[in-house]
Design a protein with these regions (language model features):
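C-terminal transmembrane helical hairpin of 12-TM major facilitator-type secondary transporters
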Residues: 262, 273-326
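C-terminal membrane-cytosol helix-exit motif in multi-pass small-molecule transporters
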Residues: 165-194, 385-389
């Protein structure tokens, strides 16, 4: 399950979302996009993602987690291939919006499926390992895109989209063959239950006042993460090329380092949350992100950019890892999908706002530095909200 989950995350976020930043400079030049239009394309993705956040629980109930994942990956593969054919800004916007729909279906269903297979003692670590697939996707695109661009010239970004779509299609087939909705489908028990039977499904329906209080606070934290990490992820390569004069190949190597460090993100912060508490895991992750944004926001030289990229990568998947574990701990595995969808709504709203706001600010100021500084302020707000969480039931 972990191996299959890595492959799903490699495709639905690592390639579908995080290759966009690498392809954006060449794509923008070919389609003559302003910074604002670049931001709107990124926002379109998250509008699609946001739509799927609302529909994912119903879709999973109707089709099951495995079928939802396969459907999502299929949509991603098709729309990424169409992006490679796009000749205008509106068509690129529509295609990438539907890529977001597919990403939402696959990501949310995969995260909920993990909670079905792993007991609380291993849930944070297992989720972290699965999310490491995002980092593999970043490394893959960080090396593939510059090489394809060098070999194919100005239109290399189109071939890159096609190749990435093919990789997602292969992942779609493999996920359909390997994944199962729960351990009982294979006559197994929940991993980490130490020989005990999987706990029976909770009989609770809906959420209590205490549950809603927790969900609101987690939602605010997830919103700050959504706004900030996507600004950095969307525009850092553009910043390196346009503001620091790096070549596409050099910027690609920078981006690949994000992927490398992010391989440790989920496992490290998942372990911290399993060992100490979910609260400590969230606060530590937000603190690392704050440092990364400040280093990018001030002109401190190339060494500071390297450190910023390393810190960003190290904390890249930390918040989703701990969030899912927290939700599953507090609400139970059978309400985890609904709870995760609710807080992911906050996350998706943040991702809708982030690229648009940063793109418009860059058009006004000619730089993304103010966006990185504002991102640091928002993650500090997230730390303050994290401090209000109780340590009840591992949080």
């Amino acid at each position: 399950i972990v191996g299959s989950g890595v492959l799903v995350m490699f495709s639905c976020l690592g390639l579908a979302r995080f290759s966009f930043g690498m392809l954006l400079p060449a794509m923008s030049e070919a389609l003559d996009l302003t910074y604002g239009q670049r931001g709107y394309i990124g926002t379109g993705y998250f509008i699609g993602y946001l739509l799927m956040v609302a529909l994912a629980p119903a879709l999973a109930k109707l089709l099951g987690f495995r079928a939802s994942i396969v459907l999502g990956l299929g949509v991603i593969a098709a729309t990424m291939a169409l992006l490679g054919l796009a000749g205008t800004y509106p068509l690129a916007l529509v295609c990438y919006t539907f890529t977001g729909v597919g990403s939402g279906a696959a990501n949310i269903s995969m995260m909920a499926l993990v909670s079905r297979w792993f007991a609380p003692s291993l849930r944070g670590t297992a989720t972290g390992l699965v999310i490491a697939g995002n980092g593999l996707g970043i490394i893959f695109s960080g090396f593939l895109v510059p090489h394809v661009g060098h070999a194919s010239g100005p239109e290399g970004w189109r071939l890159s989209w096609m190749l990435l779509a093919g990789a997602v299609a292969l992942s779609c087939v493999l996920a359909g063959l390997v994944l199962r909705n729960s351990p009982s489908d294979k006559g197994l028990e929940m991993t980490g239950s130490h020989g005990r039977r999987t706990p029976p499904p909770t009989t609770a329906k809906g959420f209590s006042r205490q549950d809603w209080s927790l969900l609101r606070r987690l939602g605010i934290i997830y919103f700050t993460f959504g706004v900030t990490y996507i600004i950095y992820g969307t525009f850092i390569v553009t910043t390196l090329i346009d503001e620091h004069g790096l070549s596409e190949a050099t910027a690609g190597r920078f981006w690949a380092w994000v992927g490398f460090f992010s391989l440790f993100s989920g496992p490290v912060f998942g372990w911290i949350s399993d060992t100490f508490s979910r609260k400590i895991g969230l606060a530590a992750a937000l603190a690392v992100q704050t440092a990364a944004y400040l280093l990018a926001g001030f002109d401190l030289g190339v060494s500071a950019l390297y450190l910023s990229i390393g810190l960003y990568g190290l904390a890249a998947w930390s918040i989703p890892t701990v969030m899912l574990a927290t939700i599953a701990d507090r609400l139970g595995t059978h309400r985890a999908a609904a709870g995760f969808s609710i807080i992911t709504f906050f996350f998706a709203v943040g991702q809708v706002v982030g690229p648009t706001a940063a793109g418009e600010l860059a058009d006004l100021t000619g730089s993304f530095s103010i966006s990185y500084k504002l991102s640091a302020c928002l993650t500090l707000v997230g730390i303050a909200v994290t401090a209000t969480l109780t340590r009840n039931t591992r949080t």
